[in-house]
Amino acid sequence: SPDTTIAHAADLMREQGLHRLPVIENDKLVGLVTEGTIAEASPSKATSLSIFEMNYLLNKTKVKDVMLRDVITVSKFASLEDATYLMYKNKVGILPVVDNDQVSGVITDRDIFRAFLEVSGYGEEGVRVRFVTEDKVGVLEQIIHLIVEEGYNIANTVNIPTKDDRVVIEVQIDGVTDLEGIRSKFEANGLKVDEITRTTAKAI
């Protein structure tokens, strides 16, 4: 709350491994307190204050005295892409998720990183095949058709446009045992494999 001391807020961040905290009053978002705002309000290491005086100051200063009041927020109905864009555009590492002026949660840069890893299939056991090809209609469909034809399961695909009007297509496949066999299958059908690697299961 706004009346929480910055000392308590700092302790809470440290205990929970957080860098920022939304400030709530009457169930509504009124600000944001960060490690940076607390550090700016804290006495310098070069201060002549005694440890007792510093502790007194930290326990007297309230969150409302240092919090950021102009907070960028996102609706709980927004897409992950919209949230990512807002964070990127506004150079912030956290977005309170607001519904009818009430905070229902927060999304952080760590959440974005985790979502990216999950979408890209990182940490899944199988085979990842990478193609660099012309960005034209039908390429991805052809890749998928050849994989399904072999009876394999596609865990996910990622398409990354390049600056030279080409596209990087990465496909995560389950059940492949013969790497050279699947490579030959693709290349026999005119699809050059840029890289093929086994992936191991990892907890995210």
Q: What do these predicted ranges mean?
A:
Residues 1-17, 24, 73-91, 98, ...:
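The conserved cystathionine-beta-synthase
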Residues 35-72, 84-88, 102, 108-144, ...:
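Tandem CBS (Bateman) regulatory domains
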